[in-house]
Regions:
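Hinge/cleft segment of the Venus flytrap/periplasmic-binding protein
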Residues: 310-372
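Sec-dependent N-terminal signal peptides of Gram-positive bacterial secreted proteins and lipoproteins
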Residues: 2-24
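Extracytoplasmic "Venus flytrap"
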Residues: 56-87, 98-107, 203-207, 256-261
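Short beta-strand elements in bilobed, periplasmic/extracellular small-molecule ligand-binding domains
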Residues: 86-109, 169-170, 217-233
């Protein structure tokens, strides 16, 4: 499963080899790299030959480990690489990026991190909470800088002392979800809700805080809460079917990577039962959920790259570099599911407008590349 790509972004930057919003998965390499056949990717981003600093450019090795192959996380990786390429060109430095995806396998994750350390990576990048926690443990003695991306609650899982002052060698970007805002949309769409399902993976630390917030909100309204969980695509599919049998009127899922990976499998189960699935990221809506509410992952990826550059080029101390959070007021609605549920998108957009910074539409697809 190993995939080794060698991508030199030099003068090719002007040709826009990568797009800022596209989603890049392990199997979707640029045209000149399609012959590569492994799971890991080595990407070198360098200044153009004409750059004044190119003759003495400094090179940095960065190891990026992605937790799982899904639309949100792939979009983050894509935009980290794209932004690093731009910074490398601008500053006249070379970023040699080693990328791999552990596919939610903790043993493989540990091996990937060990490989990065064996290659003397100058900085490690953890995409999603489980990878960040593994990198924290792996760098406890070395102090190698770690920048995490899309960690929903870095304080509660012990990655940082506080968002303002992380306190160690880790900092990064958070995709913290305003759960109450999602609940508000749910009840604006259907004020008569009496039974709501919560679908998530008990083992996902990223989901824990949001699930507790959702339960408190719903119970405060006197709504019956049905919880169903799973740790794999098959288990999530069974849990979705169980929620339909339970007679829930709506389902909520936070930024849960296991459910995200399962969405293409389960979305028809909910749509055919007339149940809207409210979720914590636009990628869920891309893969068939009724609504995704949360951060712009393309922007999160770019900002993660800015933090990487600040540490490597400007000497910023991760311990004193605040975790970056984002406005997550964008509601992404799947218009195909909207129609299937008998909901008028234009009317719903007007209804949601006072509760969101932005309402946008999307159609069902596997990746963002397919809808751009």
């Amino acid at each position: 499963m190993k995939k080794l790509l060698s991508i030199v972004l030099a003068a090719l930057m002007a040709a826009s080899l990568f797009t800022a919003c596209g989603a890049k998965s392990e199997t979707a390499a640029p045209a000149e790299s399609q012959a590569a056949a492994s799971d890991s990717t080595s990407t070198e981003t360098a200044a153009p030959a004409s750059s004044e600093a190119s003759s003495d450019a400094t090179s940095y090795t960065i190891g990026i480990c992605n937790y799982v192959d899904d639309a949100s996380l792939n979009q983050i990786v894509e935009n980290i690489q794209t932004r690093l390429a731009a910074i490398g060109e601008e500053k006249g430095v070379t970023f040699s990026v080693e990328y791999d995806n552990c596919n939610a396998d903790s043993n493989l994750m540990s091996q990937i991190i060990s490989n990065f350390q064996a290659d003397s990576a100058d900085l490690l990048v953890a995409v999603a909470t489980p990878v960040a926690m593994a990198m924290q443990a792996a760098t406890e003695e070395t102090g190698t800088p770690v920048v995490f991306a899309a960690v929903s609650d870095p304080v509660s899982v012990g990655l940082v002392d506080s968002l303002e002052a992380p306190g160690s060698n880790l900092t990064g970007t958070s995709d913290y979800l305003d759960t109450a805002a999602v609940m508000n949309l749910m009840f604006v769409q259907n004020p008569e809700l009496q039974k709501v399902g919560l679908l998530y993976d008990l083992g996902q630390d990223s989901a824990a805080s949001a699930i507790e917030s959702a339960k408190a909100y719903l119970e405060g309204k006197g709504v019956e809460v049905i919880e169903r969980t799973g740790t794999s695509v098959d288990e999530i599919a069974l849990a979705a079917q169980a929620l339909v049998s339970d007679g829930v009127e709506a389902v909520f899922t936070p930024t849960d990577n296991t459910v995200m990976k399962s969405e293409l499998t389960i979305y028809e189960t909910f749509a055919e039962a007339g149940i809207p699935h409210y979720t914590g990221a636009d990628s869920f809506a891309l893969n068939g959920a009724f609504l995704g509410y949360g951060v712009d992952y393309a922007n999160l990826g770019a900002e993660t790259a800015n933090m990487i550059a600040s540490i490597l080029l400007d000497g910023a101390d991760p311990a004193a570099t605040a975790v970056k959070t984002f406005d997550n007021g964008t509601a992404t609605i799947n218009t195909e599911i909207c129609e299937q549920l008998g909901i008028d998108f234009d009317e719903l957009s007007e209804t949601f407008a006072p509760y969101c910074t932005k309402v946008q539409s999307i159609v069902t697809a596997e990746s963002f590349d397919e809808v751009q």
